[in-house]
């Protein structure tokens, strides 16, 4: 006997929604998925009418669905946004060169202007050359740092008001786990924020897909027949994030709600006033936002150019060492006070 769509539209169900377990037809799934993203955007006031927004486009499922849905919602709900695509070419043969063809297809399909910036033109290096220098153990550190700054550089060139990234619920839950496991309180503070950055010296980043499950994004792209690039980065298997992802998938098997549980827990975390926040400023070399002097991108680039590629890896800045020392001293004083009060 066929299962009928739970939305009571009368149609036969075509899928079981991962997030809720509801049996839905394709059209009702599309409507629910799009409505949730619209609610996320409107309830969080992610955009203002008249703003220019850059969609960080990689050609993958997340950025492709993000571009498609933002264009659709912008027209349906009259957001009044000017949407553009911003893509970063890291210089990874057999991966990024192919995915950029998909980005160009997105440009044509959604009629959005596209800007492509490469590591080679920004830094004088490609990831292929960097990996040849350092091996595969720390390549994601270089790529992540350079990519974040490259997006800022591209956004500044385009004169946009914000950058919309395709981070989904799974990504954010993984990041919470990674930061807990690493004891990185600075990143743990902001990793669940739907908006980061902003202010006079930086362009804010927003995450419209923050509460969207990865499985649902794949289903949406599949049933909508969207064109996206599905090959994993050739350097990704060695990434630390992969271990957090595998752990999360194991947890999800025994507790299907674990993704949202972790996100909500991250949102509710409170930090002691004694835990210092890193102060954000402007790098004295490149002029872009940084919490250290010089910024991490400049330190890594200097190491590459000097033939010392591991110069900036695994080392803390003087400021970070001072903050760590202050936190350690405060913890020791608190412990001493507790012992004193026990007597």
Curated annotation (Swiss-Prot):
Transmembrane segments: none annotated. Its EC number is 2.7.7.-. It is found in: Cytoplasm. Keywords: Cytoplasm, RNA-binding, Transferase, tRNA processing, tRNA-binding. It comes from the Eukaryota. InterPro entries: CTU1-like_ATP-bd, CTU1_C, Ncs6/Tuc1/Ctu1, Rossmann-like_a/b/a_fold, TilS/TtcA_N, tRNA_thiolation_TtcA_Ctu1, TtuA-like_LIM_N, UPF0021_CS. Signal peptide: none annotated. Pathway: tRNA modification; 5-methoxycarbonylmethyl-2-thiouridine-tRNA biosynthesis. GO terms for biological process: protein urmylation; tRNA thio-modification; tRNA wobble position uridine thiolation; tRNA wobble uridine modification. GO terms for molecular function: nucleotidyltransferase activity; tRNA binding. Coiled coil: none annotated. GO terms for cellular component: cytosol; cytosolic tRNA wobble base thiouridylase complex; mitochondrion. Plays a central role in 2-thiolation of mcm(5)S(2)U at tRNA wobble positions of tRNA(Lys), tRNA(Glu) and tRNA(Gln). Directly binds tRNAs and probably acts by catalyzing adenylation of tRNAs, an intermediate required for 2-thiolation. It is unclear whether it acts as a sulfurtransferase that transfers sulfur from thiocarboxylated URM1 onto the uridine of tRNAs at wobble position. Belongs to the TtcA family. CTU1/NCS6/ATPBD3 subfamily. PANTHER family: ATPASES OF THE PP SUPERFAMILY-RELATED, CYTOPLASMIC TRNA 2-THIOLATION PROTEIN 1. NCBIfam families: TIGR00269 family protein (TIGR00269). This is Cytoplasmic tRNA 2-thiolation protein 1. It comes from Drosophila sechellia. The lineage of its organism: Eukaryota, Metazoa, Ecdysozoa, Arthropoda, Hexapoda.
